[in-house]
Regions:
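Metal-dependent catalytic cores of enzymes that make or break cyclic nucleotides
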Residues: 1-153
Length: 153
């Protein structure tokens, strides 16, 4: 967020949202989260509910109110094919776009039950190829942080 020139209040909101973005997964069975194989349609529906569940968990906590948007919209995509609300482009807050890139990069560069992690170079290449989904300005900010050594493998 700082790399993009966002003001301190918004950076604080992004920090809270980044920490809490997957809090809704508390409502998802561990067997689904850690399933090594393909998810069924029913399991995908449960997984796809976690942003709404997470937003509902924090929406009445006054000090976390500003992060609610980031928690709810971190799976929205620039092309409108994300969830839960199908937002696209500038309808998605900059904070949610930052968390989306960070979350996806983290997922790509971490081991999962269904695949081995990618290295940072592969993760960045993947994000760049998915420009219809992710804000490329945010992706390039991540690249600069990695190149400077602020973020390390």
């Amino acid at each position: 967020a700082e790399e993009l020139g966002i003001d301190k209040d918004q950076r604080d909101t992004v920090s809270f949202g980044a920490v809490l973005h997957d809090i809704g997964k508390l409502g998802v069975y561990e067997s689904i989260l850690n399933k090594p194989g393909e998810l069924s349609d029913k399991e995908w529906k449960v997984i796809r509910s976690h942003p709404e569940v997470g937003a509902n968990i924090i929406k009445n906590m006054k000090f976390l109110e500003s992060a609610c948007d980031l928690v709810r919209h971190h799976h929205e995509r620039l092309d409108g094919k994300g969830y839960p609300d199908g937002l696209k482009g500038d309808e998605i807050s900059i904070g949610a776009r930052i968390v989306a890139v960070a979350d996806s990069f983290d997922a790509m560069t971490s081991d999962r039950p269904y695949r081995k992690k990618h290295n940072y170079h592969e993760g960045i290449d993947s994000l760049r190829r998915q420009g219809e989904k992710f804000d490329l300005e945010v992706v390039e900010a991540l690249v600069r942080l990695i190149e400077r050594g602020t973020i390390r493998e």
